[in-house]
């Protein structure tokens, strides 16, 4: 895995102005999502997170604010916070969220935030936690969650248990993890890791297979294809999955 400075520089270089053509189509930067339309995706995420409308909520790895914009539109009385280590992306987020008084962002690592214990009703990740040690990220999220608060994880996972992958599929998975410097697990492994950490109760787990066409086109048409050696022939069997937990 790369260090924080590398990830910050990487996002500032490749995920700001160079993805403008993608931003014109979607502000929600995910490889897997049920809906390409941001409004529909926002409504789906709100339902998956079980947002009531009066909570204090944190997005860890908020990108350019696309998810926050949709959720803040749906829930104007909810207090939304977003953190990101990329100052370049947060500059874009300022414009995306300029009309929302219930949204604020700051430059922070989700592995070591400056929030007090028991601060948030909901903490969520949308394809962002794979850049860091899973256990460290989870422990920090649990720390800043209120008692009975909810943790939502929306992530890239393998389509089946890792031990059921063929040698070629496993080789492609390892290549993906190395070239994108992003940890990917199967659903069972994520659930087992969370159980081992403790302090959370699984409410629900879902899976979805639809890749984002906008995201795939962005990878094909930008420098991301070259720097990650992205080819159809070495794509591992991946899908999207989400997990909703309650702090106990």
Spans of features found by a protein language model:
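Conserved alpha-helix/loop element of class I SAM-dependent methyltransferases that forms part
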Residues: 35-53
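Conserved class I S-adenosyl-L-methionine
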Residues: 54-63, 152-174
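Class I SAM-dependent methyltransferase SAM/SAH-binding core
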Residues: 64-112
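Acceptor-substrate binding/catalytic loop of class I
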Residues: 173-189
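A short glycine-rich, Lys/Arg-flanked "PGG" loop and its adjoining helix->strand segment in the class I
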Residues: 135-150
């Amino acid at each position: 895995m790369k260090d924080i400075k590398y990830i910050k520089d990487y996002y500032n270089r490749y995920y700001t102005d160079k993805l403008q053509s993608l931003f014109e189509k979607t502000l929600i930067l995910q490889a897997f999502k049920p809906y390409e339309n941001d409004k529909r995706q926002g409504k789906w995420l709100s339902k998956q997170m079980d947002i009531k409308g009066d909570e204090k909520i944190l997005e860890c790895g908020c990108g350019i604010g696309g998810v926050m914009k949709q959720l803040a539109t749906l829930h104007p009385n909810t207090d939304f916070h977003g953190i990101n280590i990329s100052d370049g992306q947060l500059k874009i987020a300022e414009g995306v969220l300029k009309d929302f008084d219930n949204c604020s962002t700051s430059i922070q690592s989700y592995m070591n935030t400056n929030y007090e214990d028991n601060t948030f009703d909901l903490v969520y990740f949308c394809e962002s936690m794979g850049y860091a040690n899973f256990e460290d990220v989870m422990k920090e999220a649990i720390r800043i969650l209120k008692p009975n608060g909810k943790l939502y994880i929306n992530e890239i996972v393998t389509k089946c248990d890792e031990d059921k992958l063929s040698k070629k599929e496993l080789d492609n998975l390892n290549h993906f993890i190395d070239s994108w410097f992003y940890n990917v697990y199967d659903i069972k492994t994520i659930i087992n890791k969370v159980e081992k950490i403790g302090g959370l109760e699984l409410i629900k787990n879902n899976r979805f297979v639809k890749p984002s066409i906008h995201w795939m086109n962005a990878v094909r048409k930008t420098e991301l294809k070259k720097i990650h050696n992205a080819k159809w022939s070495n794509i591992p069997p991946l899908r999207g999955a989400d997990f909703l937990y309650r702090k106990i």
